[in-house]
């Protein structure tokens, strides 16, 4: 029974991941901004404060970096809220590095530790549309950050991978999105189940196929 830390578990894909992990007999530990519903209170606005927020995490086998945001409201290349853009980069690109740094001592205690980060299909460098450019850039950035992270604990046998969940029917993805969050969550956990050090640094579709960065 693996203990899995899932960030941003109060709604959307994070809530679905929590349900899927419980159904699979695992022990998920969720995080929310305010610690509601027996979750850990975790805010990602200040990466330097993340270690202190997770100091009592306890034993851990897996991290799923899921928390993220699609902001600011104005994020066109010709009309950008730059403070909002910077905040998006903090939450979506920098904090996902601070979280594994904070919990790595606990992961090292596990017999089979793993790290997954939820990215986006819009992180793909071939996606040229200018809509939501701050979000797209933040997800492209987290891909590169996590590629780099994968090389650091590789000698210790700790694999790290990224997952593209597709367009998911959540508040962020919208009702018109194609993918059911529960199905996506099961796919993500299936990737985690078979993840080995040979897969470290890879980018997967939630269905399990490798995909291009």
Q: Model-predicted segments: where are they?
A:
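C-terminal helical subdomain
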Residues: 155, 162-165, 174-213
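Catalytic loop of short-chain dehydrogenase/reductase
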Residues: 69, 76-89, 94-97, 108, ...
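Rossmann-fold scaffold of SDR-type NAD(P)-dependent oxidoreductases
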Residues: 7, 60-70, 92, 117, ...
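Conserved mid-core alpha-helix of short-chain dehydrogenase/reductase
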Residues: 49, 95-102
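Conserved glycine-rich Rossmann-like NAD(P)H-binding loop of the short-chain dehydrogenase/reductase
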Residues: 24-35
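A conserved hydrophobic alpha-helix of the Rossmann-fold in NAD(P)-dependent oxidoreductases
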Residues: 46-54, 173
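Rossmann-fold cofactor-recognition segment
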Residues: 33-48
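N-terminal Rossmann NAD(P)H-binding glycine-rich loop of SDR-like oxidoreductase domains
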Residues: 7-19
